[in-house]
């Protein structure tokens, strides 16, 4: 009977969130960008045409969303697949936000390359290579700035949708999850069909060792974990969530699990019913990962929604690469597409809009 009561309570919360998302006149999307020099490690990230270009991807993503072109580099960020390219997920987000007529705010949590658009800065430091054990130099500053903005936005809006753009983010997420004691090896997703789990684990273990962190025996707090093997977007998003008091859609996969783990570390009794994760079917069905297995370790009340844009029906060759395991998610794509669908768009209308934006 207690279980049935809890399930009914969850259904009420779900309906409440969906109703809020349908009816609210002023939801806002927050795209949090950052850099980790971990992305320069060969073979780790596909979020760019080369390792060097991964540092430009976050800035280019938001320039593309706002300006319709890129100023910080010569070409649009992309994943090269044979003779075609997989469009950046920022274009999926852009299409969905335009369809749903939702404004957005850019948050620079710590990007080495600064975008040529207006943004809110959470600090001047970008993320370092986590193998050093000093991945983020100013995690508390970023977190506190996130809390302040989260509180301010809660006074202006009824709902927040939060996404991130940071190449190698699944590796830094693995680092934070492991540092906080979660079993995440072989469970984080990635931007390529071949998920380099061994490389990710080796990178994280080297960082933990150099930070003198032993998760099995040490009582590691959230800022310590982020400072050692995290990236700037994680404390930024955790701060935004903790600082706010309104419903939130987290658009993403593995990185959002790490954010939830950080929140749980800071506030063990945090009410996760206020948070819903929305991600793509490409993450949810990733056979090389286990997002659900990670989330279950953190809190059973975290709700996750899966969005399928039906790219098997597209004639856009680049978008078809999502079906074979490239890219999968990023820049809040899952959350933005979920929002567009809840607010009245059909899947076909959404896909057609994405195709036009990606031309």
What are these regions (language model features)?
Residues 11-161, 167-359:
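N-terminal loops that bind phosphate or other acidic moieties
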Residues 1-12:
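Single conserved hydrophobic/aromatic residue that forms the stacking wall/gate
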């Amino acid at each position: 009977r207690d279980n049935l009561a809890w399930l009914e309570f969850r259904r009420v919360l779900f309906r409440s969130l969906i109703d809020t998302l349908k009816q609210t006149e002023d939801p806002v999307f927050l795209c949090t960008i950052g850099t980790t020099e971990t992305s320069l490690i060969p073979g780790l990230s596909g979020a760019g045409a080369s390792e060097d270009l991964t540092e430009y991807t976050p800035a280019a993503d938001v320039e593309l969303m706002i300006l319709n072109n890129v100023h910080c580099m010569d070409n649009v960020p992309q994943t090269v697949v044979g003779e075609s390219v997989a469009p950046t997920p920022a274009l999926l987000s852009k299409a969905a936000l335009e369809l749903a007529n939702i404004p957005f705010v850019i948050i620079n949590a710590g990007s080495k390359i600064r975008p040529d658009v207006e943004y809110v800065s959470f600090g001047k430091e970008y993320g370092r290579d986590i193998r050093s054990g000093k991945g983020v130099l100013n995690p508390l500053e970023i977190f506190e700035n996130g809390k302040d903005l989260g509180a301010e936005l809660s006074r202006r809006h009824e709902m927040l949708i939060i996404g991130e753009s940071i190449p190698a983010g699944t590796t830094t997420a693995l680092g934070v999850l492991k540092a906080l004691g979660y079993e995440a090896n072989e469970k984080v997703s990635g931007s390529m069909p071949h998920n380099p789990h061994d490389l990710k684990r080796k990178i994280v273990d080297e960082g933990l060792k150099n930070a003198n962190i032993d998760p099995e025996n040490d009582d590691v707090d959230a800022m310590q974990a982020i400072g050692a093997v995290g990236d700037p977007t994680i404390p930024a998003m955790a701060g935004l969530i903790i600082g706010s008091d309104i419903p939130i859609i987290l658009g993403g996969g593995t990185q959002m699990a790490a954010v939830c783990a950080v929140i749980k570390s800071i506030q063990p009794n945090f009410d996760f019913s206020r948070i819903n994760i929305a991600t793509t079917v490409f993450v949810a069905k990733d056979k090389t990962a286990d997002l659900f297995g990670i989330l279950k370790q953190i809190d059973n009340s975290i709700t996750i929604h899966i969005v399928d844009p039906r790219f098997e029906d597209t004639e856009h060759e680049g978008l078809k690469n999502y079906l074979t395991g490239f890219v999968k998610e990023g820049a809040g794509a899952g959350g933005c597409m979920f929002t567009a669908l809840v607010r009245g768009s059909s899947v076909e209308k959404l896909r057609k809009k994405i195709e036009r934006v990606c031309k």
